[in-house]
């Protein structure tokens, strides 16, 4: 016997169910009638992946973002595995929803999009253009204040809300909402997203996890929890990685045919899916999708 009263109350590894007879597995015979402990089989309320560290190891993180600490990268030394794992704990469903392949695909998609946003790569870069994600932590062009008049999220005097962090969080209304969710005053302190490495990752994961009408969350799309409406279908928005690009930057990149930025997002995503050994899914681009909010 491996678990339960037959084994001194031991729990099964990996969140598996302990059957009435003291054996570990996650099938109905073990998790059903008589099950002694962990009777959701590791699926739990959030999904089939026990913890994020089992989906993306430190060594995988380092290989995915292998040139982020290059001397030429402005963000060198900023983005760390520990900061990522720490930030993700504030969002228990992130990277842990669905079966293991779904969890891996979500992490590949998150890093695919954020690597594009922070890339330092170029077509002939060492190890290819998709090994240079997370080279930047702030938008290169900081001339714009990204301030949209908002009574709910007023711009602070002298502050700019240009892109910062992995997702390049932009605009006062995003800083305001994100700050509320994280318990931080990001309207007055937007630089925290580029100076505190845990807050930086938290802001990116917050954006990923949070729907903003009429857009679903990136998380719900990649985990298969988003069902397009008839309106979405007529606008070409079908489930897949392409809809996530539409959520993030559809107004500039989607619905107008081929776009190098979209291809770059796809290139990172495919590299990471290949590293995780998972399929890409369908509908990777957004070339025939109307941007959200425009139809």
Curated annotation (Swiss-Prot):
Keyword Disulfide bond attributed: yes
Limits of the Chitin-binding type-1 domain: 1-41
Keyword field: Allergen, Chitin-binding, Disulfide bond, Plant defense
InterPro entries: Chitin-bd_1 (IPR001002), Endochitinase-like_sf (IPR036861), Glyco_hydro_19 (IPR016283), Glyco_hydro_19_cat (IPR000726), Lysozyme-like_dom_sf (IPR023346)
Alphabetized GO MF terms: chitin binding; chitinase activity
Disulfide bonds listed in the record: 3-18, 12-24, 17-31, 35-39, 73-135, 147-155, 254-286
Pfam families assigned: Chitin_bind_1, Glyco_hydro_19
Gene Ontology biological-process entries: carbohydrate metabolic process; cell wall macromolecule catabolic process; chitin catabolic process; defense response to fungus
Function: Probable inactive chitinase-like protein that does not exhibit hydrolytic activity toward chitin. May bind chitin and be involved in plant defense against fungal pathogens.
Family according to the record: Belongs to the glycosyl hydrolase 19 family. Chitinase class I subfamily.
Protein name: Probable inactive chitinase-like protein LaCIC
Protein's gene: LACIC
């Amino acid at each position: 016997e491996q678990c339960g009263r037959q084994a001194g109350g031991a729990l099964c590894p990996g969140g598996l169910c302990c059957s009435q007879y003291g054996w570990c597995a996650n099938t109905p015979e073990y998790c059903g009638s008589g099950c002694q402990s962990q009777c959701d089989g590791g699926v739990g309320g959030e999904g089939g992946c026990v913890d994020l560290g089992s989906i993306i190891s430190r060594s995988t993180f380092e290989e995915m973002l292998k040139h982020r600490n290059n001397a030429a990268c402005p963000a060198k030394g900023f983005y760390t595995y520990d900061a990522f794992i720490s930030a993700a704990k504030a969002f228990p469903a992130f990277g842990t929803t669905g079966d293991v392949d779904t969890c891996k695909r979500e992490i590949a998609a998150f890093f695919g999009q954020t690597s594009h946003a922070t890339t330092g790569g170029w077509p002939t870069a060492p190890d290819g253009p998709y090994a240079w994600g997370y080279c930047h932590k702030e938008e290169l062009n900081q001339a714009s204040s990204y301030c949209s008049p908002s009574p709910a999220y007023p711009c602070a005097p002298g502050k700019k809300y240009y892109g910062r962090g992995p997702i390049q969080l932009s605009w006062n209304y995003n800083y305001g909402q994100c700050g509320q969710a994280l318990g931080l005053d990001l309207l007055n302190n937007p630089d925290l997203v580029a100076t505190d490495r845990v807050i930086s990752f938290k802001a990116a994961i917050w954006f990923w996890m949070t729907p903003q009408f009429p857009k679903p969350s990136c998380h719900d799309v990649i985990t298969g929890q988003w069902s397009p409406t008839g309106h979405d279908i007529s606008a070409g928005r079908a489930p897949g990685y392409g809809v996530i690009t539409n959520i993030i930057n559809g107004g500039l990149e989607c619905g107008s045919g081929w776009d190098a930025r979209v291809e770059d997002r796809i290139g990172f995503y495919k590299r990471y899916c290949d590293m995780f050994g998972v399929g890409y899914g369908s509908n990777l681009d957004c070339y025939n999708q109307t941007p959200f909010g425009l139809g």
